[in-house]
């Protein structure tokens, strides 16, 4: 079969194009014999898809919520400048329940039925002393993985050769989850003092929250007994949070020179968490109107978020995923005939090689013939050792509404913001862990994420990753800075009939989006993301609207700035003789290389609506010019069929819509 494959004219010509000779010429000239000859009996692995295996899920969900409250005035608190006091109190109870059942093939039963636990490969026999569950051995039926029914002609999905085999192998995976919450809250509000600029208003409140989660898997789910399916040990835990809060609004100045209005708002909250003790958050807001059309505003505040129940109590969920290992010799650095390592063809960054070596892997010996993506067991889980998230933020900006003409409306606004979050709770992905560990510029393998990678180092030529910990972890610091802009204009245009025209432009400039991790050796890993996927430096949206009588026509344009992947994660080029991620698509493409750049992106939509007293009818077109999303390398960007997903690009193309709305009881 291999000889016939190599003699196929197209295959032979392809090899000749790459290496100068056909397989037959390599053999006849005495260079190398690529023809294996008769191999005799060889072992094979059946690859089948079984009807109903892990793809049918039965789900039951129910939810109920009860709320009881009372509110009213407090007349006995009206004395002097203390007046207009009122109260509001409520208690709520919520219960959410879910039950799921999935059917599939038990891996332990399949192995037992195929003789994996027998020294003579006898089905349904265990003479090696393996510890097997009683429900795995009871009723065992030998299974024929080469039954014709598993390979139906013209179909992808087959079935086992007998009902007895199917009944023995199949089991159910059951999961019951219950989430319960009780909230009791009360607050009072009123005026406490009269100043020359107005009344000072005060609000006081208290809130108690109780949360409980009970997520119970059966043994099949908890132990991951389905073939090729993850385990999930569920979650058990509860938490109580008590809070008191206060807010005061103080009008400092009003109707004086350079201060038509000057207000200050102060608020604070004390939170007592069962697991994280007592914490405080504060907020200050200032609004100053030097002249009536102009408002200058600023805010400062802190925030606190304790880890939620899942982040605290998730008992552990395991599974398998494909992981690209940069410590293995890439295909482009291998001799295409002998498979030997060629150092001068190795284009990996020096810090990758250094970090691999620092973590116990020789990146010049680890060799899997260029196939460096492996299936790796991963585990997610919660932790009571997580720190709470804390943040500090401040903003400053202005809003201006013109008052020099009553013929048109014009408003301008701008806000600068800066948010600094410490101890952000994240659930790192395999790609994030690999990248942070092996692209660390220090090259010492000191990244905090290197400890989440477990390898089998018994064979230096094959130090495979066998386990990765994806459990929740605190990120030391996360910073976001930027500027938001908005412009609104409205005027009436007379073209025989009055047309109301408006334009609304909003835009955002991202100045910084960065993260920091402190490694065990004290060094700091800092990553910046502005201009990369998911964080374009500029975003904007323009809405043009024209209204006449009951008709409204709209044109909307959305803009996303160009983005690119982190340069540290992009290989400059790849071997044309090896497997390449892209050899087409990039503008002016001359190299086979990783490519994950998107140019400026504009998306246009339009609509026309008629609004009657009790009904509305309209139609429109989304993505008027049928703008396609960018094409990217799927190994660099989250994508499907080389199309980025989750980044704001339209995936549907030009679409038409028609809406009819009827309002019961009139307008």
Positions of predicted regions on the chain:
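Transmembrane beta-strands of outer-membrane beta-barrel pores
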Residues: 74, 91-99, 192, 206-214, ...
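Outer-membrane beta-barrel translocator domains and adjoining extracellular loop/strand segments
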Residues: 100-106, 215-221, 259, 276-282, ...
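Residues that define the transmembrane beta-barrel architecture of outer-membrane proteins
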Residues: 60-66, 180-182, 198, 238-244, ...
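C-terminal beta-signal and adjacent terminal beta-strands/loops
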Residues: 511-514, 557-576, 609-667
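Transmembrane beta-strands of outer-membrane beta-barrel proteins
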Residues: 83-91, 200-206, 246, 260-266, ...
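Short loop/turn motifs that connect adjacent beta-strands in outer-membrane beta-barrel proteins
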Residues: 73-86, 193-200, 253-262, 293, ...
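Gram-negative outer-membrane beta-barrel transporters
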Residues: 409-569, 659-663
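Surface-exposed, low-complexity loop segments enriched in small/polar and acidic residues
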Residues: 1-241, 257, 305-388, 411-484, ...
């Amino acid at each position: 079969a291999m000889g016939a494959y190599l003699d196929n004219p197209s295959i032979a010509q392809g090899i000749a194009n790459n290496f100068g000779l056909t397989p037959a010429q390599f053999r006849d000239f005495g260079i190398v014999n690529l023809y294996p000859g008769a191999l005799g009996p060889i072992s094979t692995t059946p690859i089948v898809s079984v009807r109903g295996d892990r793809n049918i899920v039965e789900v039951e969900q129910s939810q109920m919520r009860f709320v009881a409250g009372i509110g009213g005035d407090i007349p006995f608190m009206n004395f002097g400048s203390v007046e207009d006091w009122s109260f509001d109190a409520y208690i709520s109870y919520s219960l959410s329940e879910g039950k799921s059942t999935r059917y599939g093939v038990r891996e332990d039963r399949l192995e037992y039925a195929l003789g994996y636990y027998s020294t003579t490969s006898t089905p349904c026999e265990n003479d090696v002393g393996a510890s097997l569950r009683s429900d795995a051995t009871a009723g065992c039926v030998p299974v024929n993985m080469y039954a014709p029914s598993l390979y139906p002609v013209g179909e992808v999905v087959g079935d086992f050769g007998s009902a007895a085999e199917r009944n023995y192998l199949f089991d159910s995976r059951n999961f019951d989850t219950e989430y319960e919450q009780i909230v009791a809250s009360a607050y009072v509000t009123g005026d406490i003092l009269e100043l020359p600029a107005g009344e000072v208003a005060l609000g006081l409140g208290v809130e108690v929250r109780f949360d409980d989660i009970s997520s119970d898997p059966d043994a099949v789910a908890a132990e991951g007994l389905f073939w090729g399916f993850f385990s999930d040990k569920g979650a058990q835990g509860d938490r109580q949070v008590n809070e008191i809060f206060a807010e005061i609004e103080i009008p400092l100045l009003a109707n004086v020179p350079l201060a038509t209005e000057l207000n200050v708002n102060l608020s604070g909250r004390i939170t007592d968490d069962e697991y994280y003790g007592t914490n405080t958050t504060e907020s200050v807001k200032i609004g100053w109107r030097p002249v009536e059309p102009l408002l200058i505003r600023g805010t400062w505040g802190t925030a606190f978020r304790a880890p939620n129940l899942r982040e605290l109590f998730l008992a552990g969920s395991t599974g398998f995923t494909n992981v690209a290992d940069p410590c293995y010799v890439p295909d482009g650095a291998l001799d295409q005939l002998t498979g030997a390592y060629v150092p001068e063809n190795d284009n990996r960054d020096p810090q990758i090689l250094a970090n691999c070596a620092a973590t116990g892997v020789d990146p010049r010996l680890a060799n899997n013939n260029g196939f460096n993506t492996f299936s790796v067991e991963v585990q997610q889980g919660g932790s009571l050792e997580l720190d709470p998230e804390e943040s500090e933020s401040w903003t400053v900006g202005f809003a201006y509404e013109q008052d020099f003409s009553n013929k048109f409306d014009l408003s301008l606004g701008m806000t600068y913001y800066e948010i600094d979050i410490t101890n952000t709770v994240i659930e790192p992905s395999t790609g994030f862990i690999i990248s942070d560990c092996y692209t660390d510029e220090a090259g010492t393998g000191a990244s905090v994420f290197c400890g989440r990678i477990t390898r089998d180092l018994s064979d230096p030529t094959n130090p495979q990753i066998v386990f990765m910990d994806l459990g929740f972890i605190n990120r030391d610091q996360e910073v976001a800075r930027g500027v938001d802009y908005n412009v609104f204009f409205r005027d009436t245009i007379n073209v025989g009939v009055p047309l109301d025209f408006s334009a609304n432009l909003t835009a955002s400039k991202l100045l910084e989006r960065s993260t920091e991790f402190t490694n065990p050796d004290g060094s700091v890993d800092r990553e910046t993301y502005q201009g990369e996927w998911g964080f374009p430096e500029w975003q904007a949206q323009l809405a043009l609207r024209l209204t006449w009588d009951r008709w409204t026509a709209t044109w909307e344009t959305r803009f996303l700035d160009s983005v690119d992947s982190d340069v540290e994660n992009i290989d400059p080029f790849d071997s044309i003789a090896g497997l390449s991620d892209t050899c087409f698509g990039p503008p002016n493409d001359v190299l086979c290389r990783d490519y994950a750049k998107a140019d400026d992106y504009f998306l246009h939509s339009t609509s026309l609506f008629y609004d009657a007293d009790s009904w509305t009818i309209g139609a429109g077109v989304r993505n008027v010019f049928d703008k396609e999303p960018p094409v990217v390398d799927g190994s660099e960007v989250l994508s499907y069929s080389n199309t980025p997903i989750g980044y704001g690009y339209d995936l549907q193309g030009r679409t038409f819509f028609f809406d009819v709305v009827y309002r019961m009881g009139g307008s």
